[in-house]
Amino acid sequence: MKRGKISSLKGELHIPGDKSISHRSVMFGAMAEGKTVIKNFLPGADCLSTIACFRKMGVEIEQNGSDVTVRGKGLDQLAEPAELLDVGNSGTTIRLMLGILAGRPFHSTVAGDESIAKRPMKRVTEPLRKMGAKIDGRAGGEYTPLSVRGGHLKAIDFQSPVASAQIKSAVLLAGLQAEGTTTVTEPHKSRDHTERMLSMFGVSLREDETSVSIEGGQQLKAAEVFVPGDISSAAFFLAAASLVPGSEVVLRNVGLNPTRTGIIDVLKEMGADLEIEEKDTGNTEPYGDLRIKTSSLKAAEISGDLIPRLIDEIPIIALLATQAEGTTVIKDAAELKVKETNRIDTVASELKKIGANIEPTEDGMKIHGKTPLTGGAKVSSHGDHRIGMMLGIAACICEQPIDILQPEAVSVSYPSFFEHIEKLAEKA
C-alpha cells in the first residue's frame, strides 16, 4: 500500500470501541446470567475471535456491527467445546480465557495464529496449574496449542513477576471459581479493566495499590455496557495531529481510564497542545473528548511505572520522538519483546528505513530528534497492527511516499484506520 505526505488534518472522529473492554464485556456477559447488551463494541478481528470462542462453548451471541447481545446462562452452563478454540491473533483472548477454562470441568484445546504460537504462556499457565488446573502444551506448557482440563481449583496468593493485566486477569478469573480468596500482587499496577468490569457485573473485589483479592464462588449478573473509544487507537491520531502542520482534530468519547492514560502524560511532557474534556457520566470506565493541534515537541524520558500505562503506545511514541528536539529514552519496556512482534526490533528497523535516528536497547530504545523522515522505502507491519498504524502515520510526514507491506494487519484493532486518515485529510 503506497501512502504519502498529507498537508494537514482537520475534523473530528469517533474512535472505535476499546479492545480491552470489548473482549471483557463479551467474556463476562458469557459468564453471567441474563442478557448483556454491549454498545460501541469493537468489531476488529481480535474481539471477533473472542465471540467465536464463546459461541463454541454454547453461548448465544448476536453481533450487528458495534452492537452485541450476549445471552449468558452462568458459568456452569458453559459447554465443552467440540472443536479447537481458535483465538486468532489475540493474546487477550487466550490468556483471559485460560483463567475461565481452568475452573470448568471439561477438556478444551486453545491455539491461535503464528504470532500467538511464539508468545509465552507459562507466565499464565503456571499459576493456574498451582490452583489445580491441568494444562499442557509445547515446551512444557510454554507455547500453544494448549490443552486444558479444568476442574476444582484452590485459591492462591500470586506474586506476578511483571505488571501485566492479562496475567492478573487470568488468575482473578480462575480465583472467581476457586475455593477461598485469591490475591494477585504486581510490581506496578497494570490496567484495571477486569476489576472495574467485574464490579459492573456484580462481583466484589478488594483492591489496594498493587494487589487485588477476589472471593471464589460469586455469580456474575448481566449488565449494560457502553464501550468508550480505545485510547490506544486514539494515540495514533493524537500523534498525527501533533506532527502534521496546520492540524486540529477532536476525538470523541475516548476512554480515560487512569491505568491507560500514560500517552496523555507523555504528550503533555513533550509539549503537545492537547485539551481534555472529561464527561461525568457515572460510567464505570471514564471517557471524554480530546482536542489536539499541531505542536512543537521536545524529548522525554519514559520508564518505570509509566510503562504499563502506555506499553501499546510505544511504537507511536517512538515516531513522535523522531520529530521532538533532543533524545527520547524509553527503558524498562522489555515486555515489548513478547508482543505481536518483538516491538523493540520492529519499531527501530522500520523507522530507520525511512530516515529515523533510533537505537534499540535491551529494554527499550533511544530516539534522537528532530530528524526529517525521508521515506521513499518499502516498510512492513510484520503482521503487527500497531506497527502498521505507526507506519500509516509516519507516511503522513515523510518527504517521499512509502510502500507499506501487510497493511491489513490494522484490522486487528482498527479496521477503519486508513479511511479515518482520509476523512481528516479531506476536511483540511
Swiss-Prot record:
UniProt catalytic activity: 3-phosphoshikimate + phosphoenolpyruvate = 5-O-(1-carboxyvinyl)-3-phosphoshikimate + phosphate
Spans traversing the lipid bilayer: none
Protein's gene: aroA
Cellular localisation: Cytoplasm
GO cellular component, one term: cytoplasm
Family: Belongs to the EPSP synthase family.
Xref: HAMAP family: EPSP_synth
Residues binding phosphoenolpyruvate, per UniProt: 19, 91, 119, 166, 343, 386
Quaternary structure annotation from Swiss-Prot or TrEMBL: Monomer.
Protein name, UniProt field: 3-phosphoshikimate 1-carboxyvinyltransferase
Entry annotated with the keyword Amino-acid biosynthesis: yes
Keyword annotations from UniProtKB, A to Z: Amino-acid biosynthesis, Aromatic amino acid biosynthesis, Cytoplasm, Transferase
GO biological process: amino acid biosynthetic process; aromatic amino acid family biosynthetic process; chorismate biosynthetic process
Pathway in which this enzyme or protein is active: Metabolic intermediate biosynthesis; chorismate biosynthesis; chorismate from D-erythrose 4-phosphate and phosphoenolpyruvate: step 6/7
Superkingdom of the organism of origin: Bacteria
Catalytic residues identified in the record: 312 (proton acceptor)
PROSITE patterns per record: EPSP_SYNTHASE_1, EPSP_SYNTHASE_2
GO molecular function, one term: 3-phosphoshikimate 1-carboxyvinyltransferase activity
Positions with a binding annotation for 3-phosphoshikimate: 19-20, 24, 164, 166, 312, 339
Presence of the UniProt keyword Thylakoid in the record: no
Catalytic class of the enzyme: transferase
Any Pfam family the entry gives: EPSP_synthase
